[in-house]
Regions:
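Bacterial N-terminal signal peptides that target proteins for export
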Residues: 1-8
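Hydrophobic core
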Residues: 12, 16-17
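Acidic/aromatic-lined carbohydrate-recognition and catalytic surfaces
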Residues: 20-24, 29-228, 239, 250-298
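Active-site-proximal helices and loops of the catalytic beta/alpha 8
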Residues: 29-45, 135-136, 152-153, 158-178, ...
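Structural recognition of the beta-strand scaffold that forms the well-ordered cores
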Residues: 62-64, 98-103, 146-147, 246, ...
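Beta-strand-rich binding/interaction modules
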Residues: 504-523
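C-terminal beta-strand-rich structural cap/linker in extracellular carbohydrate-active enzymes
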Residues: 530-549
Length: 549
C-alpha cells in the first residue's frame, strides 16, 4: 500500500491548495489553458501524475466531440480538425485521456452519419493530412482517439449504393439481381414489394431498406464482401493511429434480433483485435439493463451504459430524488448489480458510463440547471468504473434539448462567441443564456463547474482503482442519504461516499478506524473532514477513503 499512501498524501496537499488558493482571473488564451489557472496547482498535479499515473490501457477519460460545433479554425463558421487540434491543450489540462470523434467522413448531412466515403475526411472538416496532424498532436499528449464507425447503413450517395442502383435501373424487366454481375447489389437489401422502412428507387419497381432514413440505405452485414470492406476500413484507420471505434446503432443491425446482432459484434471484436490486439470498441446499445447484459456476451469490450445515463437513467433519477433515502441507497446496489451482470457476460468488459450525448438532452436540463446537482452528476459519472465519457460542453453546464441540432450547439468558449466559436448547426435553437456562463467566465472561478470537473478527473486519473475496481455496495455505510460503494482492484481498495442530499451529514466511521480520507469533492464549498471517526459531508459532497498505511 506504499504507493497508494504517497498518492493520498499528495492528493491531500493538492486539495488543501485548492481550498486556499484563489485562481488568477487573467483571461487565458483559450487555445489551451494557462498553467496558472489550474484547480490543483501544476506542481501538485505533476507529483500526482508521477506517482499515481494510471496504466496505459483502455480505461480512459473520454471526451465526445462533434467537430462541426467545436472549434472553427478558418472562419467559415464550421468546426474543423485544425480547430480541434488547437484545443488539445485545453482538453489535456481538463484531464482528458481519450477523444471520441463523431463521424468525420464525407457526407451530405451536417451530422455525417450518412457516410459517402469511409476512407476520407469531409472537406468541411479538413483533409487526411489535417487528420494525421491531429493524431500526432494527440499522441504527444497521451490522448487516445476513437472514431465513429457507422456500419448499419451508408449514405445514399455512397459509390456502393449508387452503383447498385444504376445496375437495378438497367436490369431487364423480370430479371433477378445477380451479385456476380454487380457485387454491390448484394451489399444492401432490395425487393419489389416495399414495406415499412423501404423506399422506392425512382423510375423503377425496386425498393431498398433504410430504416432510419431514405438517405441511409441499410447494409447487409452478413454479406462476406461487406465484411471484407469493414475489415479494410478498420485497417485503414488503425494504420493512421486510431485506438478503436465507437459502433453506431448496434441493436439496429438486425432490429429486434439480439442473437443476430451479437454474432455481428462478435465478428467485429475478433476482427478488430486481430488487426490491433488492444483495439478498443464501444457499442451504442440504447436499450434496457437486461438487453445490454445480453449484448456483452458478444465479447465486445464496452457498451454505453444507458441504464445509468440519459434523463431517465439511474444517475439522473437518483439526483432528482435527492434526500430520499431508499432511492439514494439503491444507487450503489445498482452499480454492484451492473458489475455482476456485465462481468458474468464478459469477464473482460469495460463499462462506458456517460451522462448525455449528441442524441439526448444535456445533464444541465435533467437537473433543472442546479449547479450543485450538475457537480454531483459529474462525480457519479466520472467515478464509475470503466471508461467514462463526457460530452463536449458538459463541463461548463451547456444546455441542449428539443430537436437533435439543439443538442449539438456550438461549444461556448466565451460570451463574445469568437475565438473559434462556430455557427449553430441548421435548425439549432440556442438558449437565451447559459446559466453558468462560458468557459472564459468559469476558468478563473475556483468554485465553477469547470474547475470541479478538473478536480474530479484529476482524482480519477491519479487513483487507478477508481476506473478499474470491481464495485460492491458498502452496506454498513449505504444508509440514510449516503451512497456508499467499495472498489477493489488487485491489492488496492477505496470506498466512495456520496451525500446525495440537500443537507449536510455526519457519517459514523468508527468501524473504519483503519481507513483514511484520500480525496474529497465539495459541490458547495462546505468543509469535508474526518475527525475522531466522524466524517463531515456537506450537501452533494463526496469523500474517497483508502486503507491507512
Amino acid at each position: 500500500m506504499k504507493r497508494m499512501t504517497k498518492i493520498v498524501s499528495l492528493l491531500l496537499v493538492a486539495l488543501l491548495l485548492f481550498g486556499c488558493t484563489k485562481i488568477p482571473t487573467t483571461t487565458p488564451d483559450l487555445s489551451g489553458v494557462a498553467s496558472d489557472t489550474a484547480v490543483l496547482t501544476e506542481a501538485a498535479l505533476a507529483e500526482i501524475k508521477a506517482l499515481g499515473e494510471s496504466p496505459d490501457d483502455n480505461y480512459r477519460t473520454f471526451y465526445e466531440v462533434f467537430v462541426y460545433s467545436f472549434c472553427d479554425s478558418d472562419g467559415d463558421g464550421i468546426g474543423d480538425l485544425n480547430g480541434l487540434t488547437s484545443k488539445l491543450d485545453y482538453l489535456q489540462n481538463l484531464g482528458i485521456t481519450g477523444i471520441w470523434l463523431m463521424p468525420i467522413h464525407p457526407s451530405q448531412s451536417y451530422h455525417k452519419y450518412d457516410v459517402a466515403d469511409y476512407y476520407d475526411i469531409d472537406p468541411q472538416y479538413g483533409t487526411l493530412e489535417d487528420f494525421d496532424a491531429f493524431m500526432a498532436a494527440c499522441s504527444e499528449r497521451g490522448i487516445n482517439v476513437i472514431t465513429d464507425l457507422v456500419l448499419n447503413h451508408t449514405g445514399n450517395d455512397h459509390e456502393w449504393f449508387l452503383t447498385a442502383v444504376d445496375y437495378l435501373k438497367n436490369l431487364p424487366e423480370g430479371a433477378e439481381p445477380n451479385a456476380e454481375d454487380c457485387k454491390y447489389v448484394g451489399y444492401y437489401y432490395f425487393n419489389q414489394e416495399g414495406g415499412s422502412g423501404w423506399h422506392q428507387i425512382p423510375g423503377t419497381n425496386w425498393y431498398y431498406e433504410g430504416q432510419f432514413s431514405p438517405h441511409m440505405p441499410d447494409l447487409d452485414l452478413a454479406n462476406a464482401q461487406v465484411r471484407a470492406e469493414i475489415t479494410s476500413i478498420m485497417e485503414f484507420w488503425i494504420d493512421r493511429g486510431v485506438s478503436g471505434f465507437r459502433l453506431d446503432a448496434v441493436k439496429e443491425f438486425y432490429s429486434g434480433n439480439i442473437a443476430a446482432n451479437v454474432e455481428v459484434l462478435s465478428w467485429i471484436q475478433e476482427t478488430a483485435t486481430s488487426i490491433k490486439e488492444d483495439c478498443y470498441l464501444v457499442g451504442e446499445c440504447w436499450d434496457s439493463f437486461g438487453a445490454v447484459s445480453q449484448y456483452y456476451t458478444s465479447g465486445l469490450t464496452s457498451f454505453f451504459d444507458f441504464p445509468f445515463g440519459n434523463s431517465n437513467g439511474k444517475i439522473a433519477s437518483v439526483i432528482r430524488a435527492a434526500g430520499t433515502a431508499n432511492t439514494v441507497s439503491s444507487y450503489a446496489k445498482a452499480l454492484q448489480q451492473a458489475n455482476e451482470a456485465y462481468s458474468a457476460a464478459n469477464p473482460d468488459y469495460i463499462d462506458a458510463p456517460f451522462l448525455s450525448n449528441h442524441d439526448v438532452g444535456r445533464i444541465a436540463g435533467f437537473v433543472n440547471r442546479d449547479e450543485n446537482k450538475m457537480k454531483m452528476a459529474a462525480a457519479m459519472n466520472i467515478l464509475m468504473s470503466g471508461s467514462c465519457f463526457i460530452y463536449y460542453g458538459e463541463e461548463i453546464g451547456m444546455l441542449g434539448s428539443g430537436n437533435d441540432p439543439s443538442k449539438r450547439a456550438p461549444m461556448y468558449w466565451n460570451a463574445a462567441r469568437d475565438n473559434g466559436t462556430t455557427n449553430p448547426p441548421p435548425e439549432c435553437e440556442l438558449p437565451d443564456e447559459y446559466p453558468l456562463g462560458s468557459l472564459e467566465e468559469q476558468i478563473g472561478d475556483d468554485s465553477s463547474l469547470y474547475n470541479y470537473y478538473r478536480q474530479v478527473i484529476a482524482i480519477r486519473n491519479a487513483m487507478p482503482v477508481i476506473a478499474r475496481g470491481n464495485t460492491t455496495a458498502e452496506e454498513a455505510l449505504n444508509i440514510n442519504c449516503i451512497s456508499a460503494q467499495r472498489k477493489t482492484w488487485g491489492e488496492e481498495e477505496c470506498i466512495i461516499l456520496m451525500n446525495i442530499n440537500t443537507e449536510a451529514a455526519q457519517v459514523d466511521l468508527s468501524a473504519y478506524a483503519d481507513w483514511t480520507l484520500a480525496a474529497s469533492l465539495s459541490a458547495d464549498g462546505g468543509e469535508i473532514a474526518l475527525d475522531a471517526g466522524s466524517l463531515s459531508l456537506p450537501a452533494f459532497g463526496t469523500a474517497i477513503l483508502v486503507p491507512a498505511a
